[in-house]
Amino acid sequence: MKLPIPYQMAVSTVHLKLTDQSAKKDRYGRTIPSWEGDIAKCVVNMQTTYSGTNNDRQIVANGLVMMYAGYSDPIPALTKENLESKLTYKGQEYTVKSINRFDQPGHRRLILL
């Protein structure tokens, strides 16, 4: 069964500075992005997610970005090497901590950051 994509919710644009673990560094020790650009038509859910019990809680995520194949443009090829890349949304810069890929029948790919 092919699940519908919430096109009316995919109205956000994020700016991604894609780096990988083996990326070159400039003379100041900063990582040089291997790809940089805006990704249009994606769904952004800014919600703090915690993990833990009682007083031992830690922040797992501050938000979730969903990019849909065939709709979001462009979708860069993301791997686990791209962790620690920088993502800017509404002027605030965030660090990519996990990359999850969800395949769906009838779609090339669906990627969550």
UniProtKB/Swiss-Prot annotation:
<comment type="similarity">
    <text>Belongs to the Lactobacillus delbrueckii bacteriophages ORF5 protein family.</text>
</comment>
<protein>
    <recommendedName>
        <fullName>Uncharacterized protein ORF5</fullName>
    </recommendedName>
</protein>
<dbReference type="Pfam" id="PF10665">
    <property type="entry name" value="Minor_capsid_1"/>
</dbReference>
<dbReference type="InterPro" id="IPR019612">
    <property type="entry name" value="Minor_capsid_put"/>
</dbReference>
